[in-house]
């Protein structure tokens, strides 16, 4: 009886050890955070970035996010023109294949819904970009431009460069 009890105990201990070894090899699946494809940039708007540069005390910022899946730009633009009695007359995304920090480019996408006073804050989203536009944007060939009644060609510009 002692022998069968000893054999039973050895079998039980062996099964427990086997279970521990098997279960210790099973790791809990680690959940990886999804990789965000969204590109982001925070840019400063100034007259010094205009081509040619303009003299203004106006300033602004633009928080730009680009979703390559949807091919859309989401933006938050804040600005203050240099002349408090000036009005904001137009706002655009500019860009082209030959675009750069040192070149003025044509309008790629207009921005609407902005305040027409000398200062404002605007949140918005663009229409879907074409493949060509998306490639230009990602290559740093686009910029934001704010036109005013004081400087019709553009008072504030910010070149879009993603991190």
Predicted feature descriptions by range:
Residues 62, 90-94, 144:
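Divalent metal-coordination and catalytic microenvironments
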Residues 134-136, 143-157:
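Short, exposed beta-strand-loop hairpins at the edges of beta-sheets
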Residues 82-87:
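A short beta-turn/strand-edge loop motif at beta-sheet boundaries
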Residues 2-14:
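Bacterial N-terminal signal peptides that target proteins for export
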Residues 80-81, 96-101, 149-152:
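Acidic glycine-/aspartate-rich tracts in secreted/extracellular proteins
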Residues 2-4, 20-43:
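Bacterial Sec-dependent N-terminal signal peptides
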Residues 100-134:
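An anionic, turn-rich surface loop/hairpin at beta-sheet edges
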Residues 32-69:
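Transition segment at domain starts
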């Amino acid at each position: 009886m002692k022998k069968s009890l000893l054999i039973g105990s050895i079998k039980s201990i062996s099964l427990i050890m086997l279970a521990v070894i098997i279960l210790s090899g099973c790791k809990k699946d680690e959940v990886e955070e999804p990789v965000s494809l969204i590109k982001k940039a925070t840019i400063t708007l100034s007259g010094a970035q205009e081509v040619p540069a303009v003299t203004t005390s106006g300033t602004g910022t633009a928080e730009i996010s680009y979703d390559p899946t949807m091919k859309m730009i989401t933006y938050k633009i804040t600005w203050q023109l240099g002349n408090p009695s000036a009005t904001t007359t137009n706002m655009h995304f500019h860009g082209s294949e030959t675009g750069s920090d040192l070149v003025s480019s044509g309008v790629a996408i207009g921005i609407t819904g902005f305040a027409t006073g000398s200062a404002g804050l605007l949140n918005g989203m663009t229409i879907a970009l074409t493949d060509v536009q998306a490639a230009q944007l990602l290559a740093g060939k686009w910029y934001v431009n704010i036109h005013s009644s004081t400087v019709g060609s553009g008072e504030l510009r910010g070149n879009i460069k993603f991190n």
